[in-house]
UniProtKB/Swiss-Prot annotation:
Its EC number is 4.2.1.20. This is Tryptophan synthase alpha chain. One of its GO terms (cellular component) is cytosol. Keywords: Amino-acid biosynthesis, Aromatic amino acid biosynthesis, Lyase, Tryptophan biosynthesis. NCBIfam families: trpA (TIGR00262). It comes from Phocaeicola vulgatus (strain ATCC 8482 / DSM 1447 / JCM 5826 / CCUG 4940 / NBRC 14291 / NCTC 11154).
Length: 258
């Protein structure tokens, strides 16, 4: 069974997924960051593939991507860094990146290397659902790689039902149609959106991302979905701690408790 499906079959609530950008703040820290996060009890990890034009990302993750590219991070190097990761790490690993670098690598080769490396899923924010259905789905399924689709408050019920029917793993609920970044709490409008999706009784579990940074936002996300994805907050802490994942993770976990 794919590790993503395994996770959601054994844990239905309070799942914590952490995002970081490969190659930030240092080029060589990718594997060690993953190992530390697993040790700290994180349930799933999203590894960002840096790209020069990350349209869905806020200033924090844009800055991380720019620095990672300057450091020399590439998709090929990322796969090289992860080639032995499954000797030590058991939790699901998901790559998050834009279509451009993935297509330069070659989508078939990309999915095959994901399987060989032990990557369980891929989030591609700028992959149109129609293209996924017509071209990419069968290639990914052949390699047992889950393609995770995003929905926003503006996504129609019809589209959400289609995504739920034709994907497997989890649905990434973007808390707002804006770019990523921390929020102190979720307003009534956002909570109504979370509840509306929960009431649809979808087949796939849902994870809420964009704006999770403290106990309040994490608990709200967990009340309406299987858990939360935290990116900008952790990337900021990694930067502040000069790449010390141990300290950054401790500070994040502390923020989620108080």
């Amino acid at each position: 069974m794919n590790r993503i499906n395994q996770l959601f079959s054994t844990k239905q609530k309070d799942i914590l997924s952490i995002y970081f950008c490969a190659g930030f703040p240092t080029l060589e820290g990718t594997a060690s960051t993953i190992k530390v996060l697993e040790k700290k009890g994180i349930n799933m990890i999203e590894i960002g593939i840096p790209f020069s034009d990350p349209m869905a990302d806020g200033p924090v993750i844009q800055h991380a991507a720019t620095r990672a590219l300057k450091n020399g991070m590439t998709l090929k190097l990322l796969f090289d860094q992860l080639k032995d990761i499954r000797k030590e790490v058991q939790i699901p690993l998901v790559l998050m990146g834009y279509l451009n670098p993935i297509m330069q690598y070659g989508f078939k080769d990309f999915c095959r290397t994901c399987r060989e490396t032990g990557i369980d899923g891929v989030i591609i924010p700028d992959l149109p659902f129609k293209d996924y259905m017509e071209e990419y789905r069968s290639i990914a399924e052949e390699q047992d790689v889950r393609i995770i689709m995003l929905i926003t408050p503006e996504t129609s019920e019809e589209r959400i039902r289609l995504i739920d029917e034709h994907t497997d793993g989890f649905i990434y609920m973007v808390s707002s149609a804006a770019i990523t970044g921390a929020q102190k709490d979720f307003n009534a409008q956002k909570q109504a959106y979370f509840q509306r999706i929960a009431d649809m009784n979808l087949r796939n579990p849902r994870m809420i991302g964009f704006g999770i940074s403290n106990k309040q936002t994490f608990e709200t996300a967990s009340a309406h979905a299987a858990g939360a994805i935290i990116g900008s907050k952790f990337v900021t802490l990694l930067d502040e701690e000069d790449g010390d994942t141990e300290k950054a993770a401790d500070k994040l976990l502390e923020a989620l408790k108080n």
